[in-house]
Amino acid sequence: MKRTYQPHKTPKKRTHGFRVRMKSKNGRKVINARRAKGRKRLAV
């Protein structure tokens, strides 16, 4: 059986990347929450 997770950089960036997050108000909320928490990586 084929494994379910077959990583690819482009689709990952397109859905979870920093620029995508910044597009919407809720995405910016995510980034700000991660900043406040002190995350090293804000987005993928």
Swiss-Prot record:
Gene3D superfamilies: 1.10.287.3980. GO terms for biological process: translation. The keyword Ribosomal protein applies. It comes from the Bacteria. One of its GO terms (molecular function) is structural constituent of ribosome. One of its GO terms (cellular component) is ribonucleoprotein complex. InterPro entries: Ribosomal_bL34 (IPR000271), Ribosomal_bL34_CS (IPR020939). Keywords: Ribonucleoprotein, Ribosomal protein. The keyword Ribonucleoprotein applies. Belongs to the bacterial ribosomal protein bL34 family. NCBIfam families: rpmH_bact. This is Large ribosomal subunit protein bL34. It comes from Campylobacter lari (strain RM2100 / D67 / ATCC BAA-1060).
